[in-house]
Amino acid sequence: MSRLNINFLGKELKNNVITSSGCFGFGEEYSNYFDVNELGAVNLKGITLNKKDGNKGTRIAETPSGMINCIGLENPGIEYFKDNIIKNIKYSTPIILNINGATIDEYVKVAEIANEIERVDFVELNISCPNVKNGGMAFGASCESAESTTKAVKKVLSKKPLIVKLSPNVTDIASIAKAVEDAGADSVSLVNTFLSMKIDTKTRKPLLGNIFGGLSGACIRPIAVRMVYQVYKAVKIPIVGMGGITNYNDALEFILAGASLVSIGAGIFSNPILPIEVINGIDNYLKENNISNIKDIIGAAHL
């Protein structure tokens, strides 16, 4: 058995390195850079019930050690995805489908369709979306809304393990993680992007078309690692850790803090083969330190 093999929610993965939703398209786009089958899993671009064109205006802004994006969940919708895209995916790597909604009813409808797509191995529930029936507050902004959304989706998701992606824009992320665990989540992934903005000093206006966007990149990593550490102490379900990973050592920090899987996001944009470098780096680390399997160091930083 490989040092990197890991059983995640009943599925055997060849390693614990995956890609983040929104940074890897549907996977095929990166096949010219490396063999996607080398990844532990692929997390696909976020899907909604109906097609979304995304936000107008500028969508991406560079910032020191990171980037701000407000793509607006541009995607073809779950039905088109089911009937066209998923059928044409050639790689055999396990797939995580990231689902989104503007209401709990929308989440449930997307989950019902995802539940019947055989090629999808896991569903990731993105609760950072704004709840249009609750003044735009994100579904993951409180324990109550996070729990009710998770419970509703879990009820119809009978064939797939449920990962809940947590927002970092909260006061106590550990309490929210515990709430979604109690609601039936099989795993939590964290962190999503941090709410931020950039102002164009020439026009004296917000640079992004949506005014606010999500900050990602190396600048958020220390905060993300801290949050993974806190959540690991609060829940018993496995954690997918992410936020600013640019090399294998960054990934190891998340693993030592308590992440079973690590997810590579914005770092791919500047280094398309980063996931493979991280896989090889972790493997060498385990070999050099005589560690038989990656699971032996998950959460090892806890005293």
Curated annotation (Swiss-Prot):
Signal peptide: none annotated. Pfam families: DHO_dh. Its cofactor is FMN. The keyword NAD applies. FMN binds at S21, K45, G46, N98, N126, K165, V191, G217, G243, G244. Its EC number is 1.3.1.14. Keywords: Cytoplasm, Flavoprotein, FMN, NAD, Oxidoreductase, Pyrimidine biosynthesis. GO terms for molecular function: dihydroorotate dehydrogenase (NAD+) activity. It comes from the Bacteria. GO terms for cellular component: cytoplasm. Heterotetramer of 2 PyrK and 2 PyrD type B subunits. HAMAP family: DHO_dh_type1. This is Dihydroorotate dehydrogenase B (NAD(+)), catalytic subunit. It comes from Brachyspira hyodysenteriae (strain ATCC 49526 / WA1). The lineage of its organism: Bacteria, Pseudomonadati, Spirochaetota, Spirochaetia, Brachyspirales.
